[in-house]
UniProtKB/Swiss-Prot annotation:
Catalytic activity line of the entry: RNA(n) + a ribonucleoside 5'-triphosphate = RNA(n+1) + diphosphate
Naturally occurring in which organism (per UniProt): Thermoanaerobacter pseudethanolicus (strain ATCC 33223 / 39E) (Clostridium thermohydrosulfuricum)
NCBIfam families documented for this protein: PRK00405.1, rpoB
Keyword set includes Transcription: yes
Protein name per its UniProtKB record: DNA-directed RNA polymerase subunit beta
EC number: 2.7.7.6
Length: 1238
């Protein structure tokens, strides 16, 4: 039943019944492997494609011979983050320039820009920010056939030939049996026109080629062209309408579109999919042959007439070089034409070419040519090497096109299969390496243009590779990709799980992928081929649902970009499950019958049940053990990492499991992390692979342990030093802090966890806290999923987290002179400067609140023209104090904390700074946030809620032994949500705490209800897991018993401190003059259309009037009102709202004559309310930016008006009113006349 299992440094009691046959792979291998491929092979491929670059005359050629990346980056990863630079190494390329006329060769090494490096953790540091490149799920290149039905129910077949890049070919049929082709999405032409253009010019040749097909005859009747030339011209007219067509230009266009490797690329995967789909062996298997089939090489009879062709025979027929087979279908003879490829290792020839390691099928005609011309084994092998691009062409071939047409015609007779484009056999992953390679290719293509131009312009004798090559386009392409591609994302670093999941994310969006609007239901849905590849649970809620997924725990990506899942092979002869692991792609898996991982086996690994429940494609079937081909490796293999961390997942509703998976990623790291009592056994693996913990590089003994450093003496006497990260800010503002968990003198093994990171506890992922919960209502504070918590959690800092904010101040050069960072700030008292050092920068350890100065900075003000007397006095008595204004960096509204770090960068010290910046100061302020009312918490089962009240410990309900509950949850949150996993977790948590166990209950293989009941009884609890509770206020028992136990609760990154916001005055929108909205803009609260209705319904006329005028966009009225409030006078009459003026202006712009008429038919001249604005109210002194000049920060408005002589007005205002708006991010101002914002 339960057995102890060692997990890292801990022992957990595991309920798993299934032994793990396969170790879980490295979870960020997707990223690392792909990038490694790019550096070693991807780059070489691109250089090989593009070289040589030849001049237009052909007498100069530039070749890229080799490349290398230097070993040492200029700065370490941490330094790059501090300095806002990119973690990169220089790339040097060896270039050879050949002058073919003189035979002169110049070779040199050219610098090709800095190339971003991937860190150990699978991320990139770009301009100091850690970013992740998300893998993209796209349609694989290949041939896809689908069927529709016309209005009479007739089956119409259409096909699409999709390359990696290049022109598409689309075939379609109409109800009259005519087959059309569209070339590159232009107007359609009969398919026979394309065949004629390819060289089959007469009707007889076409019918000979493809057989006497009804559809072909109907199409020939429709076809108006009668020769190759006419067909070429017809196609040219479609592709280039309006250009004068000639046969030559048509020929070269057709060649360029399909048969030029530079313009048309199938990629390795496209060639593989073509050969798989169009090969004879899959198409003729299990059909009857219409003629006897003879091996053309040996002359032996392979299949007699009328005999059924087996799978093995079909493969033999293809590999001996037969490309056309006639089969019988319902008495008709049908011609099946392959794409003329053979498996070179099985083709009957006297030479052994296995050493060449050619995996792809090769073009038969090229192979025959090689074999005819050479007779010596070595010569044959060399020739095969040299002509690899022809043997396995990257572009489409004539044979391919004919085979695709043949397949289309065969489908009418039911030969072949229709494709499902949502099947994972037809979708592939483009990971970092390939995305980067494509970007690099674009850069090199631009570089090629520049080089060709320069070759023609420059003097041939003076040319060197250096002055031919301009690296800017290459560098720009790479920079653009990392900086602004949709797939290059700012890493989600809230906690280690968020990091890990982000690197394993799979997105169907992005360039070359789908768009949210166009993606239909089918693409988003779970497909049976996702099994073991993409998690059916973890995907976002909202517009991206189903378009963004997550790789499952055991999935891996093969060389073609298809996702593979592992299976154990079953020995059919004995019915024994072996330990041999086979990785299969989705389309390979379709051919086999696969048993579940939890199918019971005896001690000899044989199936116990007489009927085994298995999967075959999308069906669930029961078969005898002898028919099973494979068995799942682990029950976890169908879900992602985050989902496999939910205990009792099998008892949760899928929608709630989805929320649970997503919310674990939002848990903030707590000060005292605590691993879950009820885990699933994957916590250790997740923490280690996320890269936040420190692992020992070698065996050894711990020599020294400090808070920020661990030293280990290895066996051979070397010292390994590990520097730890202390209180660093993550991308999301959470705290990254590592702490040692070993002591001096401890022996450590290689790969052992020696330091915990954020949200880890002895090497295990620890996202939350184990708290004592009771499912009971308490005075209505549980209404609508609200959570009642005990003050104990606040007092003990159980749910306290540290958040770090970063503030930057830059001293720039302005037109009036440089800004200066200084302690001498005008009009600021000494008490405001008490924590600044002599440079004017805050000291580390200072406690700051909103409005405090972090960095003192002054900016020069415009000098006024001096009179002659002043100039004279200036000359005699020396420089008067320079005119400067205070532009210090202050703590924004609502923020506070302790300064934990200050970094100063300046030009003088040789730091790299942006142009125009002389000095930069970066201040880090840390906040300790205790759990508070309004914070969001959640369990792991999608059970989320907001804290409604924090109750004193003595008022909380308590257990018979006096232990008070820590949290009360609403029992009504369970039944309708159907996430029963939380109840089982609570019961098991109660027992585990009593026994002092840590438990592992893996998904789909965990503790059962019986196990839990047995343990409850063993520990002396009631079998229903309920306990009598007592009211903390009165001490009286509650009427009913209550389910009590330990649940793992997370504090989520939706904290009330980040959402609280209040405004008195602040920025206004430019056109409507209404306050902006949102906390970031320091905006007001929107009083929308429906809210106005509510006031109208109650006849609250005065309230309504002031909301629509002085509280919103009556420009002069609001200033007068503010002044009236400050001076304690009565509020004046409202004026005319700005929106009304805008409306009038809009109507006038439509050339309408607008008149404003009062109740008693008096016309108000429109002039009047335009003069309103020139009121005598000193609006600027109140920093109510009336002209809506959002380009001027508030300080500047204030200063200008100050000079205009409003001193006395200002003195009357009380000191404690703060007019400083938070920030001036102006959103686009949409005019909505029905809604007024206040």
């Amino acid at each position: 039943m339960v057995r102890p299992v060692q997990v890292g440094n801990k022992t957990r009691m595991s309920f798993a019944k299934i032994d793990e046959v396969l170790e879980m792979p490295d979870l960020i291998e997707v990223q690392k492997k792909s990038y490694k491929w790019f550096l070693e092979e991807g780059l070489r491929e691109v250089f090989r494609e593009i070289s040589p670059i030849e001049s237009f005359t052909g007498n100069l050629a530039l070749e890229f011979v080799d490349y290398r990346l230097e070993n040492n980056p200029k700065y370490s990863v941490e330094e790059c983050k501090d300095r806002d630079t990119t973690y990169a190494v220089p790339m040097k390329v060896k270039v050879r320039l050949t002058n073919r006329e003189t035979g002169e060769i110049k070779e040199s090494e050219v610098f090709m820009g800095d190339f971003p490096l991937m860190t150990e953790k699978g991320t990139f540091i770009i301009n100091g920010a850690e970013r992740v490149i998300v893998s993209q799920l796209v349609r694989s290149p290949g041939v896809y056939y689908e069927q529709q039905f016309d209005k009479f129910g007739k089956k119409l077949i259409s096909a699409t030939v999709i390359p990696n890049r290049g022109a598409w070919l689309e075939y379609e049929e109409d109800s009259n049996d005519i087959v059309y082709v569209r070339i590159d999405r232009t107007r359609k032409v009969p398919i026979t026109v394309l065949l004629r253009a390819l060289g089959y010019s007469t009707d007889i040749q076409i019918l000979d080629l493809l057989g006497e097909e009804e559809k072909l005859k109907a199409t020939l009747d429709k076809d108006t062209t009668k020769s190759e030339e006419e067909a070429l011209i017809e196609i040219y007219k479609r592709l280039r309408p309006g250009e004068p067509p000639t046969v030559e230009s048509a020929k070269s266009l057709l060649y360029a579109l399909f048969f030029d490797a530079k313009r048309y690329d199938l990629a390795k995967v496209g060639r593989y999919k073509f050969n798989k789909k169009l090969a004879l062996k899959t198409r003729i298997a299990n059909l009857k042959s219409a003629k006897k089939i003879v091996n053309p090489v040996t002359g032996e009879i392979l299949v007699e007439e009328g005999e059924k062709i087996s799978k093995e025979k079909a493969e033999e027929i293809q590999n001996c070089g037969i490309n056309v087979v006639e089969v019988l279908v319902e008495g008709k003879v049908v011609k099946v034409i392959g794409n003329n490829t053979v498996d070179i290792n099985k083709y009957p020839m006297p030479y052994d070419v296995s050493s060449l390691n050619i995996k792809e099928a090769v073009n038969l005609s090229v192979l025959k040519e090689i074999l005819d011309n050479f007779s010596d084994e070595e010569a044959v092998i060399n020739e095969i090497k040299n002509r690899m691009d022809e043997l396995v062409p990257k572009h489409i071939t004539k044979d391919d096109i004919i085979a695709t047409i043949s397949y289309q015609l065969n489908l009418t007779h039911g030969i072949g299969s229709i494709d499902d484009i949502d099947h994972l056999g037809n979708r592939r992953l483009r990971s970092v390496g390939e995305l980067l390679q494509n970007q690099f290719r674009i850069g090199l293509a631009r570089l090629e243009r520049v080089v060709k131009e320069r070759m023609t312009i420059q003097d041939v004798n003076e040319i060197t590779p250096q002055n031919l090559i301009n690296i800017r386009p290459v560098v720009a392409a790479i920079r653009e990709f990392f900086g602004s591609s949709q797939l290059s994302q700012f890493m989600d670093q809230t906690n280690p799980l968020a990091e890990l999941t982000h690197k394993r994310r799979v997105s169907a969006l992005g360039p070359g992928g789908l768009s949210r609007e166009r993606a239909g239901f089918e693409v988003r849905d779970v497909h049976y081929s996702h099994y073991g590849r993409i998690c059916p649970i973890e995907t976002p809620e909202g517009p991206n649902i189903g378009l963004i997924g997550s790789l499952t725990t055991y999935a891996r990506v093969n060389e073609y970009g298809f996702i593979e899942a592992p299976y154990r092979r079953v020995d059919k002869t004995t019915g024994t499950v072996t330990d041999e692991i086979v990785y299969m792609t989705a389309d390979e898996e379709d051919e086999y019958i696969i048993a579940q991982a939890n199918e019971p086996l005896d001690e000899n690994n044989r199936f116990i049940n007489e009927k085994v429940v298995c999967r075959l494609k999308e069906e669930i079937i029961a078969v005898p053990p002898t028919e099973v081909d494979f068995m799942d490796v682990s029950p976890k293999q169908i879900v992602s990492v985050a989902t496999s961390m939910i205990p009792f997942l099998e008892n949760d509703d899928a929608n709630r499991a989805l929320m649970g998976s997503n919310m674990q990623r939002q848990a903030v790291p707590l000060i005292k992390p605590e691993a879950p009592i009820i885990g699933t056994g994957i916590e250790y693996k997740a923490a280690v692979d996320s890269g936040v913990v420190v692992l020992a590089k070698n065996d050894g003994v711990v020599e020294k342990v400090a808070a920020d450093k661990v030293v280990i003496r290895t066996k051979d006497g070397r010292r390994d030093e590990y520097n730890l990260l202390k209180f660093k800010r993550s991308n999301q503002g959470t705290c990254i802090n590592q702490r040692p968990i070993v002591n001096e003198g401890d022996e450590v093994k290689k790969g052992q966890v020696i330091c915990d990171g954020p949200s880890t506890d002895y090497g295990e992922l620890a996202l939350g806290k184990n708290v004592l919960v009771g499912f009971m209502p308490w005075e209505g504070y549980n209404y609508e999923d609200a959570i009642l918590i005990s003050e104990e959690l606040v007092r003990d800092d159980s749910l306290t987290s540290i958040h770090i904010e970063e503030y930057d101040a830059e001293a720039r050069d302005t037109k009036l002179g440089p800004e200066e960072i200084t302690r001498e700030i005008p009009n600021v008292g000494e008490d405001a400067l008490k924590d600044l050092d002599e440079r004017g920068i805050i000291r580390i350890g200072a406690e700051v609140t909103a409005g405090d100065i972090l960095v003192g900075k002054v900016t020069p003000k415009g000098e006024t023209e001096l009179t002659a007397e002043e100039r004279l006095l200036r000359a005699i008595f020396g420089e008067k104090a320079r005119e400067v204004r205070d532009t210090s960096l202050r703590v924004p509204h609502g923020e506070s904390g302790i300064v934990v770090d200050v970094k100063v960068y300046s030009r003088e010290n040789g730091d790299e700074l942006p142009p125009g910046v002389n000095q930069m100061v970066r201040v880090f302020v840390a906040q300790k946030r205790k759990i508070s009312v309004g914070d969001k918490m959640a369990g792991r089962h999608g059970n989320k809620g907001v804290i409604s009240r924090i109750l004193p410990v003595e008022d909380m309900p308590f257990l018979p032994d006096g232990t008070p509950l820590q949290i009360c949850l609403n029992p009504l949150g369970v039944p309708s949500r159907m996430n029963i996993g939380q109840v089982l977790e609570v019961h098991l948590g109660l027992v585990a705490k009593a026994l002092g166990w840590q438990i592992a209950t893996p998904v789909f293989d965990g503790a059962t209800e019986e196990d839990i009941q047995e343990l409850l009884a063993k520990s002396g609890f009631s079998p229903d897991g309920k306990v009598q509770l007592y009211d903390g206020r009165t001490g009286e028992p509650f009427d009913n018993k209550v389910t009590v136990g330990y649940m793992y609760m997370l504090k989520l990154h939706h904290l009330v401190d980040d959402k609280m916001h209040a405004r008195s005055t602040g920025p206004y929108s430019l056109v409507t003059q209404q306050p902006l909205g949102g906390k970031a803009q320091f905006g007001g609260q929107r009083f929308g259309e429906m809210e106005v209705w509510a006031l109208e319904a109650y006849g609250a006329a005065h309230t309504l009037q002031e909301i629509l005028t002085v509280k919103s966009d009556d420009v002069s009225g609001r200033v007068k009102t503010y002044e009236a409030i400050v001076k304690g006078e009565n509020i004046p009459e409202p004026g005319i709202p700005e929106s009304f003026k805008v409306l009038v202006k809009e109507l006038q712009s439509l050339a309408l004559d607008v008149k404003v008429i009062t109740e008693d038919n008096q016309e108000i001249p429109l002039k009047e309310f335009e003069d309103d604005d020139d009121s005598d109210v000193p609006d600027a002194t109140l920093n109510i930016n009336i002209e809506g000049r959002e380009d001027t920060p508030p300080e500047e408005v204030y200063e200008e008006s100050y000079e205009e002589g409003f001193e006395e007005e200002i003195e009357e205002l009380p000191e404690d009113i703060d007019f400083e708006p938070d920030s001036f991010d102006i959103e686009n101002d949409d005019l909505d006349l029905e809604d007024f914002d206040i």
